[in-house]
Amino acid sequence: MQVILLDKIGNLGSLGDTVNVKSGYARNFLIPQGKAVMATKGNVEMFEARRAELEAKVAEQLASAEARAEKVNALEAVVIASKAGDEGKLFGSIGTRDIADAITAAGVEVVKSEVRLPEGALRTTGEFEISVQLHSEVFATVKLQVVAE
């Protein structure tokens, strides 16, 4: 299925690219989230008419993400207290929602889908470097300290 991208999508393309994707991916993800439209003649003409407006919107989103990244990078260590055993093993785990809530409480608005935990949830106490993806091109890192209550 041919679609026109309205946003930069990793491993697919950037704004204005016409790409061929599987129909389920287009119908269930790209089109409902407003990241693409079907590549019909009418949509191609409409896109070309709105191209400058869409490019300005994408540039504005990128600028706001970069400003948020500076705030996240400026944070000192974010501390999360959790119940833990004698050897520093947590009762339960700390996931993306807990980290996003802690960063938001520290003063920078972050949602859980922006927090990246490649090794999965944190299950021990200690210091961790957490990556936050605020935009497809903008990453920030924050130091996270997990301490026992």
Curated annotation (Swiss-Prot):
Domain of life: Bacteria
Listed Pfam families: Ribosomal_L9_C, Ribosomal_L9_N
Cellular component aspect of the GO annotation: ribonucleoprotein complex; ribosome
GO molecular function, one term: rRNA binding
Keywords: Ribonucleoprotein, Ribosomal protein, RNA-binding, rRNA-binding
InterPro entries: Ribosomal_bL9 (IPR000244), Ribosomal_bL9/RNase_H1_N (IPR009027), Ribosomal_bL9_bac/chp (IPR020594), Ribosomal_bL9_C (IPR020069), Ribosomal_bL9_C_sf (IPR036791), Ribosomal_bL9_N (IPR020070), Ribosomal_bL9_N_sf (IPR036935)
GO biological process assignments: translation
Gene3D superfamilies, sorted: Ribosomal protein L9, C-terminal domain (3.10.430.100), Ribosomal protein L9, N-terminal domain (3.40.5.10)
Record HAMAP family: Ribosomal_bL9
Function according to Swiss-Prot or TrEMBL: Binds to the 23S rRNA.
Family from the record: Belongs to the bacterial ribosomal protein bL9 family.
NCBIfam families listed in its UniProt record: L9 (TIGR00158)
Protein name: Large ribosomal subunit protein bL9
